[in-house]
Amino acid sequence: MFQQPGDDGVEVEERTIHGIPVTAVEIKTEDGAETLDRAVGKYITIQTGLLSSETLNLKALGECVSEVLTEVLSRYKGSTLCVCGLGNRELVADSLGPDVIRNLSLKVFSGVASLNGLFKSVCSFVPGTAWTNNLDTELMVKGILKEANANCLLLIDSLVTRNPERLCQSIQVSTAGGMNPFFAGRSIDWSSLGVPVISIGVPLAITADTFIQSGVLTDESFTTLHAHHAVAASSFIISYAILRTCWPDLTTQDCIDFIRFNRDVIPYPDRNFDEDDTGDNAVPDETT
């Protein structure tokens, strides 16, 4: 379904990508922004269903998110992209940003001349939180963007929602800068950075007032275990999508293997492992 912008300056498009329902709401005018109480820009919701690596087709979701990211990032082709993972890695529901960055050892790709990329250069970082490092996140982001000569910022963050039905059940992309962060104190004036800000996140928390007023949530609606599964699934999906977007030549299996390698790296001594190496020093096919 496609809805032309009306007098309110809002355009809505609904489609299906790799079998996944996707809704895009584009606010084109200040009147539309005032009506919806949001900044001018495009807001894309990918309806994943309950995020869990046990029940979802993560490859299809990864391809879907990759197509969405490619659409919003392709205008910056040939420039330098900086990927920022906001959040506290020690707090499960706020660890999405750092968890995605953990999956992306981007230095590997900078040395592969034969690998065509969408961007001239891609870098990533985790600024941490003011709660843990007592540093202003906005200043850190500005400094890194300046030193990296970045032309665009891709922001990854855990989100908060007032709608219980969206909790851990969608991936959201916005071209209007940061969305509702997990901690209200982390809100940043992204327009002051001087570069376009594309944000991607997952609603992993619900506001306390909504929790109290709705009366529809049970103890099973949002538990630590639930958040853990949601973060694991969504970080894989987003990491996969970033790799496929930045380096379209990578195959599906390339991306999966790369993410898996970064998560399952084991320390090893300074020696070569032969294919038939056995015994205590052998490298396992998988970690358990």
Regions from the language model: what does each represent?
Residues 57-114:
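N-terminal active-site beta-alpha-beta segment that forms phosphate/nucleotide-binding
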Residues 41, 56, 60, 64, ...:
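Conserved active-site and cofactor/substrate-binding residues in soluble primary-metabolism enzymes
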Residues 122-151:
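Catalytic-core regions of hydrolytic enzymes
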Residues 114-118, 123:
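Conserved nucleotide-cofactor-binding alpha/beta core module
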Residues 125-126, 139, 155-280, 284-287:
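A structural signal for small-residue-enriched, beta-sheet-centric alpha/beta enzyme cores
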Residues 31-75:
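An N-terminal, well-structured beta->alpha segment
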Residues 46-49, 80-91, 124-128:
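Short glycine-rich or small-residue beta-strand-to-loop segments that form or flank ligand, phosphate
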Residues 1-41:
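N-terminal amphipathic/basic leader segments beginning at the initiator methionine
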